[in-house]
Amino acid sequence: MTRGRRLGMLCLVFRPILHGLFALGMAAFASGCSSGTETGNPPFQAELSYTAYSSAPQLVAVGDAGGQAVVDSAWLDLDTVALLGQGRCVEPEPAALSLPGLGIGDHASGQHNATRFAVSRAEYCALELTFVLAQPEQIQGGVPQDLQWHSVMLAGSLADGTPFTLLSAATPTVRLEADAGSFEISAKQAKTLIGFDLATWLADVDWASATRVGGAIDISAQQNAALLAQFESNLARGVALYRDADGDGKLDDVRVRLAHGE
């Protein structure tokens, strides 16, 4: 069973069990991951946003012409996010603050896609984000049919006008390690952003070697599988956590990276 709602163009799908896990995670966090007293660290509303961007728009652009490749849509199915408390990363089973999965969304649409949660001031050593396969019952409300049984679907065109589609069924749990050993979420710095760097994801894709059918490039397990492997090898490396100082769900002009995948 799933429960869905719409936020802008983003279809959010929550699994009821996650709400129980979230409550348990909050309790574990309050007892084991925060420092100071309850009075000293009152809870506040925090926000975790998600967006696709390009660190090299001359190579891969998002939505606008100008790159060797232009990505018009970036559909992802994202499950639970776990924040690992400072000092817990060295333990075999680190305590985590679990946030409900965002679900399915187009992260190149320009919409502000976010999860809001209550938390007390604390430091974290890492974040874990899980990609999952889109289920048949989730294909609704504008979600492309081809996303079914896949976790990632990118669509766009090359500079010469050739359309392309990439479908991946990879389901990794991507771990973002803190750049400086730990990062803090506080009432004054409560908004963060997970960025998906499409330039990193597509950097090693050899478009010239792609097999074209009907003038289009399809990259999947069935066609151009070597190019899919190039993409999937860069998946974790293209995900990072940033501050979102103005809370607009986009990368700040002066980027402050908190954690990164490898």
Model segments located where?
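C-terminal motif of bacterial Sec signal peptides marking the signal peptidase cleavage site
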Residues: 29-32
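Bacterial N-terminal signal peptides that target proteins for export
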Residues: 2-22
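A short, solvent-exposed, low-complexity linear motif enriched for acidic/polar residues
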Residues: 34-262
